[in-house]
C-alpha cells in the first residue's frame, strides 16, 4: 500500500475523534451482465464499491459521477437509488447514499489512491470485500431494488 494515503487516513482519525463530524458519502454498484466492479484503495485492505465524499454545494448524483470519473475513469449512464445507510465507525456520523448503474464505460485511467480495479463475477466474489460493500451486494441480489434505509 502506498504510504502517503495511509498516513493521511491515520492522521484523520484523531480529528474525527475530537470533532465527531457528520459526513455524506456516495457509492455505486457498477453491474455489467453477471459482473460487478470493485476497487481496492492504497490505504485500505478490502475491496470496496467505488465512490467517495460529497463536496459542499454538490448534488448526490454529481458527487458519484465525479468520484468514479476521478478514481477509476468511469462515465456513468442512468442511475437508480438503492438506499441510504448510516455508519458510525471511526468516530464519524457517516451517511452513505448507494446507487446502481448498469450503463457505464471505463477509460482505463486510475487515481493514485486506487491500487486496483477489477470486474468480478458476482457468483465468484473475493473473500476480502468490506463488510458494508458485501451487504449492499447481497441486498441487491435478493430484493426488488426499491430504495432502503439502514445501517452500513
Predicted regions and their residues:
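Conserved Nudix-box catalytic region and its N-terminal flanking loop in Nudix hydrolases
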Residues: 31-70
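Residues embedded in well-ordered beta-strands
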Residues: 27-29, 35-37, 96-100
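Short secondary-structure boundary/capping segments
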Residues: 20, 28, 39, 89, ...
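Acidic, metal-coordinating catalytic segment for phosphate/diphosphate chemistry
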Residues: 1-27
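Unchanged
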Residues: 54-77, 86-140, 148-151
